[in-house]
Amino acid sequence: MLRQGRGLSDLRPITMTRHFIKHPEGAVLVEFGDTRVICTASVEESVPPFLRGKGTGWVTAEYSMLPRATHTRSSREAAKGKQSGRTLEIQRLIGRSLRAVTDMTKLGERTIYLDCDVIQADGGTRTASITGAYVALVDAVSALLVQGKITGNPLKEAVAAVSVGIVDGQAVLDLDYQEDSSAEVDMNFVMTSSGRFVEVQGTAEAEPFTLEQMDAMRSLAMTGINQLFTYQQEALAR
């Protein structure tokens, strides 16, 4: 199996460029190999109706792809008048993942919107979105602290995500599109920096997988996510 010079346990080249857009409180271009996602964090001084008057905040996410982010053009979902099931699933996953590491009571009655827009897709767009959105969220929270709008940091720890799978009978880390398309098993792991799991998604595309294979994929995912935490920290230190 060819991985463009990568070992089975290697991430693709990872880049996180902060302040990629000037207007949002947080804006990051995250690159997992040829997958590129712009993640922005925008603060609004309001909360959803179910939280009004409760003194607590909210973190939510939206996800989309440019029409030609993939090999062939896809119509904009706005033109179709509805979001696809895949889009809804991914943006809910992003929102859940970031809420898992946020203390909403420290946000006050405000919402942070995480917008993840895929400008080029080559596998792992949801995992790249979660990983980049965390960095954007840190910048947005930092802006609130500097402005004196909040007095304590609501972020409890970091969160990141990576894909793993079984390709040609072998456990591999951080699948690109070609690998994902031929994978016998495809899994996504979302974890916090304390080593806890936020979400595990796994599907056998062909033969069912064994407990041993799942353990091998989990081990790879944990190794990869720990590396992603380092990339996040390095980006935030620049």
Curated annotation (Swiss-Prot):
GO molecular function, one term: tRNA binding
Binding site for phosphate: R86, G124, T125, R126
Gene3D superfamilies per the UniProt record, alphabetical: GHMP Kinase, N-terminal domain
Domain of life (superkingdom): Bacteria
E.C. number(s) listed in UniProt: 2.7.7.56
Alphabetized Pfam families for the sequence: RNase_PH (PF01138), RNase_PH_C (PF03725)
Keywords: Nucleotidyltransferase, RNA-binding, rRNA processing, Transferase, tRNA processing, tRNA-binding
Record InterPro entries: ExoRNase_PH_dom1, ExoRNase_PH_dom2, ExoRNase_PH_dom2_sf, PNPase/RNase_PH_dom_sf, Ribosomal_Su5_D2-typ_SF, RNase_PH, RNase_PH_bac-type, RNase_PH_CS
Uppermost EC category: transferase
Catalytic activity annotation: tRNA(n+1) + phosphate = tRNA(n) + a ribonucleoside 5'-diphosphate
Keyword rRNA processing in annotation: yes
UniProt keyword tRNA-binding, yes or no: yes
Subunit structure and binding partners: Homohexameric ring arranged as a trimer of dimers.
Family under the similarity heading: Belongs to the RNase PH family.
Role played: Phosphorolytic 3'-5' exoribonuclease that plays an important role in tRNA 3'-end maturation. Removes nucleotide residues following the 3'-CCA terminus of tRNAs; can also add nucleotides to the ends of RNA molecules by using nucleoside diphosphates as substrates, but this may not be physiologically important. Probably plays a role in initiation of 16S rRNA degradation (leading to ribosome degradation) during starvation.
Protein's recorded name: Ribonuclease PH
Classification lineage: Bacteria, Pseudomonadati, Thermodesulfobacteriota, Desulfuromonadia, Geobacterales
